[in-house]
Amino acid sequence: MTERTLVLIKPDAVERQLIGEIISRIERKGLTIAALELRQVGEELASQHYAEHESKPFFGSLLEFITSGPVMAAIVEGPRAVAAVRQLTGGTDPVEKAAPGTIRGDLALETQFNLVHGSDSTASAQREIALWFPGI
C-alpha cells in the first residue's frame, strides 16, 4: 500500500547545503518525491505544525529555529513511507539515539539542529501535508 508522508529539510540542513544528500537518500530507499517546495516558514504555519509541543518549554526556541531560514518541504510517497522515512532520519537526538547510517546519525550533532522532520504516523502525515500543501 502506498503511503504519503511529509518531510521537512530544516534551516540548518538548507544552510549546510544538504538538500541533495537528504533527497538522494530518500530516493535511494525507493521512495518518490511527489511534491517539493522551498519556502520561508511564517510563525502561524510553524505554530500549527508544532501545536502538540505548545506547552513544552522548548516551543519558543523551536518556532524561532524553524522560521530562521528556508525550509524544503516535500511530500514523499511509497510503500510504508512514514516508517521508511523515520528509519532514514534516525532518532531525534543525533548523537545518543540516531544510528550511524541515518541522516541524523551521519550528519547532525545537536537535538535542536537535527536537519530533518518526518511525520510520526499516517494521521500526522495527513494533517501535516494538509498544512504545508493545502492544494494537494
Swiss-Prot record:
Q: Where does ATP bind?
A: K10, F58, R86, T92, R104, N114
The record's section on NCBIfam families has:
PRK00668.1
* Predominant place of localization: cytoplasm
Function, as annotated, reads: Major role in the synthesis of nucleoside triphosphates other than ATP. The ATP gamma phosphate is transferred to the NDP beta phosphate via a ping-pong mechanism, using a phosphorylated active-site intermediate.
Catalytic residues identified in the record: H117 (pros-phosphohistidine intermediate)
Enzyme Commission number(s) of this protein? 2.7.4.6
Specify the protein name. Answer: Nucleoside diphosphate kinase
Its required cofactor(s), as named, are: Mg(2+)
Q: Which SMART domains match?
A: NDK (SM00562)
Q: Where in the cell is it found?
A: Cytoplasm
Q: Which GO terms describe its biological process?
A: CTP biosynthetic process; GTP biosynthetic process; UTP biosynthetic process
Q: Share what the entry says about its subunit structure, partners included.
A: Homotetramer.
| UniProt GO cellular component terms | cytoplasm
What reactions does this protein catalyze? a 2'-deoxyribonucleoside 5'-diphosphate + ATP = a 2'-deoxyribonucleoside 5'-triphosphate + ADP; a ribonucleoside 5'-diphosphate + ATP = a ribonucleoside 5'-triphosphate + ADP
Q: What GO molecular-function term can you cite, just one?
A: ATP binding
| Organism this protein belongs to | Mycobacterium leprae (strain TN)
Q: Source organism's superkingdom?
A: Bacteria
Can you tell me which family this protein belongs to?
Answer: Belongs to the NDK family.
Which keywords label this protein?
A: ATP-binding, Cytoplasm, Kinase, Magnesium, Metal-binding, Nucleotide metabolism, Nucleotide-binding, Phosphoprotein, Transferase
The UniProt entry, under Pfam families, shows:
NDK
